[in-house]
Amino acid sequence: MAIRRLILLSLVALFSASGLFGQDDKGITADQLVAKNIEAKGGASALQGLKTLRLSGKLLVNDGKLELAYLQTKKQPGEVRTDATLQGMTVVQAYDGKEGWKISPFQGRKDPEKLSADDCKSLIEDAEMSGPLVNWKEAGSTVTYVGREDVDGTDAYKLKVVRKNGDVNFVYLDPDHYLEIRTVSQRTEQGAQIETETDLGDYEKIAGVFIPFAVESGARHSPDKQKIVIEKAEPNVEVDDAMFRFPAPAAKK
């Protein structure tokens, strides 16, 4: 009898841990799901220990017909720079925690240009090393669990994040592993509502933290999406803050 009871308790623990126990979602809270997400990513200590991250790989656009070399560097608490290179020309987007800028050579603009506050919104989100759920209270956001939703056949947990500026992120967590499999960002830019959908997968553990190595994003419900394939991740590399800042004008001769 004791052995049968032990087996039963073990099965209950297994199903609970895998997310298969209690499918009616009774009692599930946003705080519980956020805690599960943090644990799944590697834990608060590992997340805090990831101070910088350099990701390199390829950016596929136009349904994969164009391939650009991709390089992104992030630094806590909120700096990011992304370089995408094709045929010797490099597109740059960067945010230093206060202001953003870009270089757009494919549009005939080879000099750096500052971005408006609205144009910086996507960069600010991208700069978040661990996503919008970790440290959401400190960021002034609110998080609500809104139920389950199908994500390409997966009955995902859906969380709504309302940021301090009023923009909204929906975060979809895998029910078994509690990692993000999709995010939907709703932002107001230049008076227009922008909705971007991002799918995440192929997670690998880097310095104790699970990082997605496949990211596909674009306008929601649009077939035209870009895909990022990470080939190398370098944690806690030495990073010069100057790379995130708007370049100083070249000295005149």
Where on the chain are the PLM-derived regions?
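Acidic/charged, solvent-exposed loop-and-adjacent secondary-structure segments enriched in E/D, K/R, S/T
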Residues: W101-G131
